[in-house]
Amino acid sequence: MQNTKIGIIGGSGLYDIDGLQNPTWQKIESPWGTPSDEILTGTLQGVDMAFLPRHGRGHVHSPSSVPYRANIDALKRLGVTDVISISACGSFSDDIKPGHFVIVDQFIDRTTARESSFFGTGCVAHVSVAHPTCQRLSQACQEAAVAQGITAHCGGTYLAMEGPQFSSLAESSLYRDVWGCDVIGMTNMPEAKLAREAELCYASIAMITDYDSWHPDHGEVDVKEIIKTLKGNSAQAKGLISHLPATMVSEQANCPQGCDKSLEFAILTAPEMRAPALLAKLDAVAGRVL
């Protein structure tokens, strides 16, 4: 058994959380670079919490420049067991409206300019991301959303685009009509893959702000409208977070899905051939198996 520690990665419009006891902003050093910001730690209804604003307070990092590896490594160093991503997204469905939330369970990764793995030359590893989110943690998020009175859709495919520009009409139509995606965003990849490499349970909550550019009745993405919707979504997200402790146990056994054992047989490089410099950087992420 280990103590549950929830790590919240807040996206656009969500730069802190309410109700923490003994709140402290901590600067965490990482060999993978400087995290997006200091991490807010404390307890919420007896459960240890950590909050990291993905873009930094004041929104200083674009989706492409977010230090994803440093962020996940820093949360791991803090002892986080469960990572919940909350991010602003567009919708590809009339049924998924602005103000709704989607508990994402699949991704299509279209990012092109980001470091997507902790591993590489000197220590090669291959983890499975067939099911990239944790079912147990996603269910807890769904229950917390319902408790907050949020319209939350259970399951959906997230198209991760590079950005920072929004989609063209042709791209939006492709993702919706041909690929069957449900939502679109710019930040959950490689974040979800890195969380899996770090043996962290990961869940993704998409806060819907717009219809991307496919919808004939809504036109192209309007940043002013996004910001307006974000304010309401952020308040709802904070309410959802306040319900999380009631949906999760303070101590947990091994993840039923095996998220916490994802590196068990993943490293292929022979021990005598592993690069010491890379192994030193992997002390938190892969220390259990190294």
Which role fits each region the language model picked out?
Residues 253-290:
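A short, charged, Gly/Pro-tolerant segment at domain boundaries
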Residues 1-131, 287-290:
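Metabolite-binding pocket within alpha/beta catalytic cores that recognizes anionic/polar moieties
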Residues 136, 140-151, 239-247:
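Generic non-transmembrane alpha-helical segments
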Residues 213-261:
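His/Asp/Glu-rich mid-to-C-terminal helical/loop segments that flank catalytic regions of hydrolases
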Residues 186-224:
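Zn-dependent metallopeptidase/amidohydrolase metal-coordination segment
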Residues 76-79, 176-177, 196:
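Non-catalytic positions within long, well-ordered alpha-helices that form the structural scaffold/packing
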Residues 147-182:
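Active-site/ligand-binding-proximal alpha/beta "capping" segment
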